[in-house]
């Protein structure tokens, strides 16, 4: 059991393709102000001062080139076809971890201070921690034909960011019990009936997914915000 003092290992799945981003390469390797999104995401983790080791998971054919791109202390391993496969590959080389962060490479502008706050919550005894922001748009649920089936109460909704943090023991249990594809690690923990703690996120920790997101991210970098 984690005692609040053990090592923190951050996993960065970076095998997603840049289809919605309009790029012909994995989106983690798209340029953002003269360097890749992946490099910026890893730098943020290291600059937080709260992470002991970073493990990056990429397509097998990019392992060697990624190692030359990142600082020597970063571990790079091959992932799988799905995000869950990549996180499992990262966990397999994180035996030393008491705590694990899972961070999207596409959230390249995440402030180091947010990363440190997630880790602080873990060290204070939380088993699962996620950063969130209030949802500003009204959300509708729809059926397969596009007909509206409901309107969730907006005050109860939150947009989830990363890094998501967990005790290593809990995240391993969640992945051992996972029987399908998941885009959210906290969701796997919830399936175990475990409580997930939310903290206030940061606007700049947005996920760079669409061409418009990339325009915004590049503008922020150019203005010197990051």
Curated annotation (Swiss-Prot):
InterPro entries: IspD, IspD/TarI, IspD/TarI_cytidylyltransf_bact, ISPD_synthase_CS, Nucleotide-diphossugar_trans. Disulfide bonds: none annotated. Keywords: Isoprene biosynthesis, Nucleotidyltransferase, Transferase. One of its GO terms (molecular function) is 2-C-methyl-D-erythritol 4-phosphate cytidylyltransferase activity. The keyword Kinase does not apply. Its EC number is 2.7.7.60. Gene3D superfamilies: Spore Coat Polysaccharide Biosynthesis Protein SpsA, Chain A. Pathway: Isoprenoid biosynthesis; isopentenyl diphosphate biosynthesis via DXP pathway; isopentenyl diphosphate from 1-deoxy-D-xylulose 5-phosphate: step 2/6. The keyword Isomerase does not apply. GO terms for biological process: isopentenyl diphosphate biosynthetic process, methylerythritol 4-phosphate pathway. It is an enzyme of class 2 (transferase). The record marks 154, 207 as: Positions MEP for the nucleophilic attack. The record marks 20, 27 as: Transition state stabilizer. It comes from the Bacteria. It catalyses: 2-C-methyl-D-erythritol 4-phosphate + CTP + H(+) = 4-CDP-2-C-methyl-D-erythritol + diphosphate. It holds the Pfam family IspD. HAMAP family: IspD. Catalyzes the formation of 4-diphosphocytidyl-2-C-methyl-D-erythritol from CTP and 2-C-methyl-D-erythritol 4-phosphate (MEP). Belongs to the IspD/TarI cytidylyltransferase family. IspD subfamily. This is 2-C-methyl-D-erythritol 4-phosphate cytidylyltransferase. It comes from Rhodococcus jostii (strain RHA1).
């Amino acid at each position: 059991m984690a005692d609040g003092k053990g090592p923190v290992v951050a996993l960065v799945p970076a095998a997603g393709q840049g289809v919605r981003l309009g790029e012909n390469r994995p989106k983690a390797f798209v340029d953002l102000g003269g360097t890749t999104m992946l490099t910026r995401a890893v730098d943020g983790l290291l600059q937080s001062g709260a992470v002991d080791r970073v493990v990056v998971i990429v397509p097998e054919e990019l392992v060697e080139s990624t190692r030359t791109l990142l600082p020597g202390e970063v571990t790079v391993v091959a992932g799988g076809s799905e995000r869950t496969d990549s996180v499992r590959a990262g966990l397999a080389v994180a035996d030393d971890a008491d705590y694990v962060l899972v961070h999207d490479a596409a959230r390249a502008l995440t402030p180091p201070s947010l990363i440190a706050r997630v880790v602080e919550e873990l060290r204070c005894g939380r088993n699962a921690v996620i950063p969130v922001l209030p949802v500003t748009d009204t959300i509708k649920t729809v059926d397969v034909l596009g007909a509206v089936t409901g309107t969730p109460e907006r005050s109860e909704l939150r947009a989830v960011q990363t890094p998501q943090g967990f005790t290593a023991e809990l995240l391993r249990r969640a992945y051992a019990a996972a029987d399908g594809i998941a885009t959210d690690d906290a969701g796997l923990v919830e399936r175990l009936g475990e409580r997930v703690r939310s903290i206030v996120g940061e606007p700049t920790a947005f996920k760079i997914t669409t061409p418009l997101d990339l325009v915004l991210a590049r503008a922020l970098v150019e203005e010197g915000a990051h």
